[in-house]
Amino acid sequence: MTVMIKKIARKKCIHVMLVYTGGCNACDIEVVNAIFSPFYDAEQYNVFLTFNPREADILVVTGCVTKVVAESLRKIYEKIPEPKAVVAVGACALMGGVYKNIGGDLGTSDFVAGPVENIIPVDVKVPGCAPRPEDIIAGIVKALPKVIEGK
């Protein structure tokens, strides 16, 4: 029953959950700008931001994944119902950004767990520091077939 209701709801709207895993917050600002600002107004296309993983269709992850939040990110991912998609946004989410080499050229970091794809599967990658809202919207649109059609 719940799966059927979710499928019907997905035909009407898409819920995006934003998770910040560490960094400067520039990508978060651009994601919120892409969804809420009057210029882009993703809500007019029935794309909404949610903070409940059980309501989410697409998980947007920003920032390098710190060791402190890695397990929380896994748990959030597991709570999102199938089919789901993950969009990694920004240089930090894709490769660790400026935080990647925090341990130096010869060492590893005691703080950074790595890029998002080391923790959970990533379906779409949106590069940039910070990416433009148009690129973030394009990344979300690219993830839609997996969510809507289960592909």
UniProtKB/Swiss-Prot annotation:
Disulfide bonds: none annotated. Its cofactor is [4Fe-4S] cluster. The keyword 4Fe-4S applies. Binds 1 [4Fe-4S] cluster. Pfam families: Oxidored_q6. GO terms for molecular function: 4 iron, 4 sulfur cluster binding; metal ion binding. Keywords: 4Fe-4S, Iron, Iron-sulfur, Metal-binding. Gene3D superfamilies: 3.40.50.12280. Transmembrane segments: none annotated. [4Fe-4S] cluster binds at C24, C27, C92, C129. Belongs to the complex I 20 kDa subunit family. This is Uncharacterized protein MJ1363. It comes from Methanocaldococcus jannaschii (strain ATCC 43067 / DSM 2661 / JAL-1 / JCM 10045 / NBRC 100440).
